[in-house]
Regions:
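Conserved H-loop
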Residues: 8, 39, 143-145
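Conserved RecA-like ASCE ATPase "motif II neighborhood" in helicase/translocase motors
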Residues: 78-130
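Walker A/P-loop NTP-binding motif
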Residues: 14-29
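Structural motif
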Residues: 2-4, 35-37, 109-113
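Conserved strand-to-helix beginnings and helix N-cap segments that scaffold or border functional pockets
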Residues: 16, 48, 121-125
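Conserved nucleotide-state-sensing and coupling region of NTP-binding domains
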Residues: 29-96, 235
């Protein structure tokens, strides 16, 4: 299930809430392990902290966050760290590094975050899709990183019926309509106004400039730097 999303719209935060509910359920109720894969350690920490927050909100019985040993590549350094939250259900949420071999022999839900920016997404997907055979799920979340990126190829293949799956799309304006700016106001402790929201949206688009098409409007750029319209994307997907 790929999700094409704009920058900073809360997709990972929302995914964490769903993942906590999944891991907190019993096996009979559909519970299973969740494996989160970001492309650096900071993403793993942010995600696990979001899961811990949601676990408290849902009053899910969990242990403390447990550090473990795994290799993350970050700025040329090899950092040994994973993070695990264990639930009373017996299931756990684990943040792993981006090595495809990490998923071998595992079962549950796989979340690949900012998939278009992983160095070996094709191999990572191969390893993740094996979990579907025994009833697992694979959630692939990302902003775009060009039209030739494996993430965009995956989306086009699903739209064309060459691969199974569902594609979800959340662009920046949709997120604003659903309350993104209201949440920003809450975090910044300022009052929401319609005029303020309009100006804020305009300012965000202005500082992204030409990159707003890809970063905010979920339209992948061509290799030449031009942008693909939504209608052209859909037309190409069924050629």
């Amino acid at each position: 299930m790929p999700r094409r999303s704009s920058r900073r719209t809360g997709i990972t935060w929302a995914e964490a809430s769903d993942n906590v509910l999944t891991a907190a359920r019993s096996r009979a109720a559909g519970g299973m392990n969740v494996y989160y894969i970001g492309y650096n350690m900071d993403m793993a920490i942010e995600y696990i902290e979001a899961c811990a927050l949601w676990a408290r909100v849902f009053n899910a019985a969990v242990s403390e966050i447990e550090p473990g040993e795994e290799l993350f590549e970050q700025d040329g350094d090899r950092v040994i760290k994973t993070y695990t939250i264990r639930f009373e259900s017996g299931f756990r949420i684990v943040a792993l590094s981006s090595r495809p071999a990490n998923l071998r022999g595992k079962q549950g839900v796989v979340v690949i975050d900012e998939a278009a920016f992983h160095s070996d997404l094709d191999e990572l997907l191969k390893a993740a899709l094996a979990l579907l055979i025994w009833g697992g799920r694979v959630h692939v979340i990302s902003t775009h990183n060009g039209d030739q990126n494996p993430f965009n190829v995956l989306i086009n293949d699903i739209r064309a019926g060459r691969r199974a799956g569902k594609v979800h799309r959340v662009d920046f304006r949709e997120a604003v309509a659903d309350g993104l700016y209201r949440r920003v106001c809450l975090r910044r402790r300022i009052d929401w106004t319609a005029e303020g929201e309009t100006q804020w949206v305009a300012d965000v688009y202005k500082f992204y400039g030409e990159a707003a098409n890809e970063e905010l409007d979920v339209s992948p750029s061509q290799g030449s730097g031009a942008w693909l319209s939504q209608s052209l994307i859909e037309a190409r997907s069924i050629d």
